[in-house]
Amino acid sequence: MIMSLGPYASFIVTSYAAAALVVAILIGWIATDYRSQTRRLRDLDRSGITRRSGRSAMDRP
């Protein structure tokens, strides 16, 4: 199944390639940020800092 894109083929292909590149960059950015946040949380847990959301209602003043 071969489609003829007409005289705008280069524009269409370039647009799809640019969109794919942007999506790939965003996925990479999110993956890098996730690893960074996970590492920071692990370091905080190791240092003894606890999360406020982990406390029960009875622990609050």
From Swiss-Prot:
InterPro entries: Haem_export_protD_CcmD
Annotated GO CC locations: plasma membrane
Parts of the chain that traverse the membrane: 11-31
Pfam family of the protein (one): CcmD
Membrane topology according to the record: Single-pass membrane protein
Any one biological process term the GO annotation gives: heme transport
Subcellular location: Cell inner membrane
Heme among keywords: no
Main function: Required for the export of heme to the periplasm for the biogenesis of c-type cytochromes.
Family that this chain belongs to: Belongs to the CcmD/CycX/HelD family.
Name by which UniProt lists this protein: Heme exporter protein D
Organism field: Bradyrhizobium diazoefficiens (strain JCM 10833 / BCRC 13528 / IAM 13628 / NBRC 14792 / USDA 110)
